[in-house]
């Protein structure tokens, strides 16, 4: 059964890390385009869907929840004097005044590959960790089956703090249910 489990998870991740025996049963899967663990989710898992949000009176805006939420002030706070260069090199401004990664940098993996190719550019090496961080400025991850999973510690993101209090409270309740009720039932039944 464990070989089957590992083979199945190879569809979603290049590598799996098992910290302890519980990790063998509750596998944390990081999609191939991501590098950081906060952009992973349990496999198997009971994903969220749009109705889970609507039932809690949360307007489901997939782009707002699943794409990095990057404002001009966040870029200036992170990059200080280099903010202008970073905006021009890595981002495009969208119709809402927010910043989206350019297509060639729209995943952590693409960003890392670019920086590794630019070995002589000290400036790029210095900003890599901040750019990777910006990729994690999300509330939800979308899986290959169009289900949604909360980003770990979403409450610590600028994206979350930018929401109104009612939405934050509702998301917190759903987050707690997702991690501590919904998944436990699945693992209890399939453990």
Report the location of each language-model feature.
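Catalytic cores of glycan-processing enzymes that make or break glycosidic bonds
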Residues: 1-191
């Amino acid at each position: 059964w464990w070989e089957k489990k590992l083979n199945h998870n190879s569809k979603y991740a290049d590598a799996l890390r098992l910290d302890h025996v519980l990790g063998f049963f509750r596998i944390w899967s990081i999609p191939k385009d991501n590098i950081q663990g906060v952009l992973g989710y349990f496999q198997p898992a009971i994903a969220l869907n749009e109705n889970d949000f609507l039932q809690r009176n949360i307007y489901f805006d997939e782009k707002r929840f699943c794409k990095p939420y990057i404002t001009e002030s966040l870029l200036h706070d992170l990059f200080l004097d280099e903010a202008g260069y970073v905006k021009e090199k890595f981002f495009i401004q969208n119709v809402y005044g927010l910043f989206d990664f350019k297509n060639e940098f729209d995943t952590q993996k693409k960003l890392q590959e670019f920086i590794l190719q630019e070995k002589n550019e000290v400036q790029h090496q210095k900003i890599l960790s901040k750019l990777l961080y910006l990729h994690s400025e999300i509330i939800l991850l979308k899986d290959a089956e169009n289900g949604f999973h909360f980003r770990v510690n979403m409450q610590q993101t600028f994206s979350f703090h930018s929401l109104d209090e009612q939405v934050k409270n509702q998301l917190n309740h759903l987050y707690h249910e997702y991690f501590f009720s919904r998944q436990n039932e699945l693992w209890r039944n399939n453990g």
